[in-house]
């Protein structure tokens, strides 16, 4: 190579390409790979033959002139374009340094042009100088890399297939916000502008999927939906064709784009839900027992409420069996009817208060961040106490701060008047107390039932006492016998007199006590906790101002809906509930730990 004689630039340009039979290296970024391609200063004797400018300087157009750029083609295309007259401004734009920027850099191809180029059939006609410049773009490779210079030949060259196009070959700068050839043809979408994604899936090249088996196709496109047009949406009709040309759908892939219109016609295919996962109550983690498909619930504790129901049903049944018939015929039918009404009110309110959701607050609403394993174990955690300002009902401007606490068991910040029951293992809204006779908490949703049960049980016990005693006394007077003989005749009614006298004081005391609490605007827990402070420091922020307003606000308020809705189907991923059913969870973790800590006998040696 070093012994080769040196030649001038003009001689090398005129003789190098015909002599060599191999293509020259492609130009990169508009800079020629050979220094001999650079034009001389005079611009008359030699010409710059680069991968971008392969025509003589007289036929090149200025970059500043508006119009379609010249096609970057091979020598064959150059021989066809030499007859075009040169521009008057071409001399002013000549320089001894070639253009460093590709002319298509500022005019990337839009997705509409790309779709039109790929779907256009290959034409065999030879382009003439009078044809539009788009015909030259369709029959020549418009990529910088593919425009290598080949040796000139008189044999006709095979026409290249229509180019896929790149972002450097579109003659007009597209609007990236609206210009896109949507596969559905009815809406304009935001184009990503990545033509390289067309080569994403090479496995599907020339595979034609039947339309009825294509799951990704939208077959229910309304034909009457007018397409949204923009000035750049007519680029595919530059040749004057009003009807769309047939497209070859082989190896086509839909461009990635995001919908810019809220009225998109694309269907959202939701993933099919899993099989029947059960109801919400099956995934509840509290110490609550459910039955009746989640309609009824009770604390998972000693069922003392069964004994309470027996204490109500058994004496009432004895009264209906022995005293009610005699009183119906000898005194008045109103006596047993009124007793039946009181029994119905008492027993129904007992059932409601015992099996109704008292107002359980959902869990895991405010989970704390987990501690870092590498953190300091002695580091103080986040605070679990706070204060909430409550506007007083007795004043338009006054307010009072009430304490709230974070429940580490339920992972929630409790609202005011909410407490955690250690028996039910639940945070209950406006918790009054846990009633062992109901085996359930008494909260906001069942407090009215509890109050009705206590009051009706008091009236029922007093009515049982009076009706049974009237039965014995009226019989003694009508028959003219002694009191002992009347008792000996009606032993069961006399036993109901004793039972009523023993049973009435307890519900009567509860009734009076809760009338006192309701009148003060406090719950049982609030009243007991207030005694920890001096009388001057005791406050009642939830009172309505007087006794009657407090009674109305508690006894006449509507019952709020349940928060957890235990009867509804369980949805996977509900953070309020557990991810595993109760029956699938280990029943006793401590028992399992004891089993692990048991003594394991040594394995006997073999052989």
UniProtKB/Swiss-Prot annotation:
Residues 327-330, 471-497 are lumenal. It comes from the Eukaryota. The active site is at 435 (s-palmitoyl cysteine intermediate). It catalyses: L-cysteinyl-[protein] + hexadecanoyl-CoA = S-hexadecanoyl-L-cysteinyl-[protein] + CoA. Residues 53-66 have a biased composition (Low complexity). Residues 1-305, 352-449, 519-607 are cytoplasmic. Residues 405-455 form the DHHC domain. Residues 73-102, 125-156, 176-192, 227-242, 257-272 have a biased composition (Polar residues). It is a multi-pass membrane protein. The chain crosses the membrane at residues 306-326, 331-351, 450-470, 498-518. It is found in: Endoplasmic reticulum membrane. Autopalmitoylated. PROSITE patterns: DHHC. Its EC number is 2.3.1.225. Keywords: Acyltransferase, Endoplasmic reticulum, Lipoprotein, Membrane, Palmitate, Transferase, Transmembrane, Transmembrane helix. Pfam families: DHHC (PF01529). GO terms for cellular component: endoplasmic reticulum; endoplasmic reticulum membrane; Golgi apparatus. PANTHER family: PALMITOYLTRANSFERASE APP (PTHR22883:SF43), ZINC FINGER DHHC DOMAIN CONTAINING PROTEIN (PTHR22883). Palmitoyltransferase specific for Ras proteins. This is Palmitoyltransferase erf2. The lineage of its organism: Eukaryota, Fungi, Dikarya, Ascomycota, Pezizomycotina.
């Amino acid at each position: 190579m070093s012994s080769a004689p040196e030649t001038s630039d003009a001689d090398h340009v005129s003789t190098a390409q015909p002599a060599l039979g191999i293509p020259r290296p492609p130009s990169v970024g508009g800079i020629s790979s050979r220094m001999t391609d650079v034009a001389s200063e005079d611009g008359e004797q030699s010409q710059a033959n680069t991968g971008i400018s392969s025509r003589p300087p007289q036929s090149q157009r200025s970059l500043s002139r508006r119009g379609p750029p010249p096609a970057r083609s091979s020598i064959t295309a150059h021989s066809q374009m030499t007859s075009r007259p040169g521009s008057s401004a071409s001399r002013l734009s000549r320089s001894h340094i070639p253009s460093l920027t590709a002319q298509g850099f500022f005019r990337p191809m839009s997705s509409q042009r790309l779709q039109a180029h790929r779907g256009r059939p290959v034409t065999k006609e030879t382009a003439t100088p009078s044809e539009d410049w788009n015909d030259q773009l369709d029959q020549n490779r418009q990529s910088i890399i593919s425009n290598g210079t080949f040796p000139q030949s008189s044999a006709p060259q095979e026409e290249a297939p229509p180019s896929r196009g790149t972002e450097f070959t579109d003659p007009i700068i597209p609007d990236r916000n609206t210009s896109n050839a949507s596969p559905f043809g009815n809406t304009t979408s935001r184009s990503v502008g990545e033509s390289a994604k067309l080569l994403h899936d090479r496995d599907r090249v020339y595979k034609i999927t039947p339309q009825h088996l294509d799951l990704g196709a939208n077959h229910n496109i309304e034909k009457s939906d007018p397409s949204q047009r923009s000035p750049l949406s007519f680029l595919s009709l530059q040749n004057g064709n009003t009807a769309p040309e047939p497209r070859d759908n082989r190896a086509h892939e839909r461009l990635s784009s995001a919908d810019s219109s809220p009225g998109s016609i694309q269907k959202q295919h939701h993933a099919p839900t899993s099989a029947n996962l059960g109801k919400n109550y099956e995934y509840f983690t509290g110490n609550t027992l459910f039955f009746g498909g989640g309609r009824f619930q009770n604390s998972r504790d000693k069922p003392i409420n069964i004994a309470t129901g027996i204490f109500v049903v058994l004496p009432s049944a004895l009264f209906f069996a022995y005293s009610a018939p005699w009183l119906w015929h000898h005194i008045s039918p109103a006596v047993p009817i009124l007793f039946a009404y009181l029994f119905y009110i008492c027993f129904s309110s007992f059932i409601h208060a015992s099996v109704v959701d008292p107002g359980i607050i959902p869990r895991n609403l405010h989970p704390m961040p987990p501690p870092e394993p590498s953190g300091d174990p002695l580091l103080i955690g986040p605070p679990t106490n706070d204060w909430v300002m409550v506007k007083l009902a007795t004043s338009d401007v006054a307010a009072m701060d009430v304490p709230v606490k974070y429940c580490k068991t339920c992972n929630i910040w409790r609202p005011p008047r909410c407490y955690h029951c250690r028996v039910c293992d639940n945070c209950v809204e406006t918790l009054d107390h846990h009633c062992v006779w109901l085996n359930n908490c008494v909260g906001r949703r069942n407090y009215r039932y509890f109050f009705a049960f206590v009051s009706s049980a008091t009236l029922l016990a007093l009515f049982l006492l009076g009706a049974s005693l009237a039965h014995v006394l009226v019989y003694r007077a009508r028959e003219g016998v002694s009191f002992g003989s009347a008792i000996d005749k009606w032993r069961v009614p006399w036993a109901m007199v004793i039972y009523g006298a023993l049973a009435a004081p307890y519900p009567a005391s509860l009734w009076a006590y809760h009338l006192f609490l309701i009148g003060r605007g406090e719950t049982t827990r609030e009243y007991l906790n207030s005694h920890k402070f001096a009388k001057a420091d005791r406050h009642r922020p939830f009172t309505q101002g007087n006794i009657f307003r407090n009674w109305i606000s508690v006894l006449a308020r509507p019952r709020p809906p349940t928060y957890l809705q235990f009867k509804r189907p369980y949805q996977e991923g509900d953070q309020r509930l557990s991810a595993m059913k109760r029956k699938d969870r280990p029943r006793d973790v401590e028992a399992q730990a004891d089993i692990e800590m048991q003594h394991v006998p040594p394995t006997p040696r073999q052989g």
